[in-house]
């Protein structure tokens, strides 16, 4: 069975938004921008690098299961391209991602930090998402993250 949700796991200040807009032009896709952001903001204590967090929390669902349900419902009608931030995935072993096609987008760290520091001074590895992206990569590469038939 073809996986119908394509989940781009990126960090801020990458080309992820441009990539999302390119998928939005394809008639077979519906595009969702950072669907787990509301859930993430509800869970983290330091929101200093999220200047519009109150507005985002009012506008977006806080419940991870509701977000997953919405994406899977959309996937019944069309292919789904979800532009997600790696650090918005707060679980150690996000098994729900195993049913989706996941793409990890990584920008050269030096360029990423330089770009991000123009917006947020002294960015941390957590804020730029690179640490979480690596953790997700490790999860996908472990036996519990691998699924029979998905790998050689």
Task: Specify the residue positions occupied by each region the protein language model found.
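PAPS-dependent sulfotransferase catalytic core
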Residues: 1-75
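Phenylalanine-focused residue identity feature
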Residues: 6, 23, 29, 36, ...
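PAPS-dependent sulfotransferase catalytic domain
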Residues: 82-152
